[in-house]
Amino acid sequence: MTYSLRIADLPSNERPRERLIACGSQSLSTAELIAILLGTGQGKGKLSAVGLGQYILNQLSQYERDPLSILRNITVQELTQIHGIGTAKATTILAAIELGKRVFQSRPPELAVVESPQAAADALSQDLMWQTQEKFAVLLLDVKNRLLGTQVITIGTATETLAHPREIFGEVIRQGASRVIISHNHPSGNVEPSPEDINLTKQLLAGAQILDIPLLDHIIIGNGEHSSLRQITNLWEDYPQRG
């Protein structure tokens, strides 16, 4: 794709809107998605909307970070410092980013059945995803694995003990839940469990056996990713849970 051509001058199979309709939004590059938001480029003889989208990403790459991670929290003032981006284009980009955040963070309806690690991560994303502080939360379920609610138990840092079994199961009992999924976030984005994560999970699985409140999983959430300790460890074989 030539970035200096107007989008109208491109072959139809290279135009972002037409490609989105024909192939789906996931097939577009980040620059093409931005181009759809921009609508127009810098003007005659200059960058097209796609070229301007790529130029924005290139400018943000100068900070030696993923451009998308910078876009997530960018301001109108920062965007309008980029040549070719005025207030109208900047506010359109920010509105799209905020809408994407809200869609991503939306919780499933109450009493939705949580049947997979992905469903659990979706339910907890508003509390734990993209957070700069480490948080520990519980997903409260009834006997049929229907979602009763979520609760952040503690907020701390990676060097602190985030949660004690007494706090976790105390909340489960207070809320009248029959089953529980625990979760915490890694602000670094790395969702591999640490030795401390493994040890805490062992303690909680043992406590769940004593209290007869099945602990179904421990989900670690990062920047758009998650991992299930039930899937990647043998802990549930060592500490089997009822049901």
Swiss-Prot record:
Lineage: Bacteria, Bacillati, Cyanobacteriota, Cyanophyceae, Oscillatoriophycideae
All residue ranges annotated as the MPN domain in the record: 113-235
Pfam families reported in the protein's UniProt record: RadC, UPF0758_N
Disulfide bonds: none
GO biological process, one term: proteolysis
Native species: Trichodesmium erythraeum (strain IMS101)
PANTHER family reported for this sequence: DNA REPAIR PROTEIN RADC (PTHR30471), UPF0758 PROTEIN YEES-RELATED (PTHR30471:SF3)
Molecular-function annotations in GO: metal ion binding; metallopeptidase activity
Record-given protein name: UPF0758 protein Tery_2667
Family stated for the protein in its record: Belongs to the UPF0758 family.
Residues holding Zn(2+): H184, H186, D197
Motif segment (JAMM motif): 184-197
Keywords for the protein's UniProt record, in alphabetical order: Hydrolase, Metal-binding, Metalloprotease, Protease, Zinc
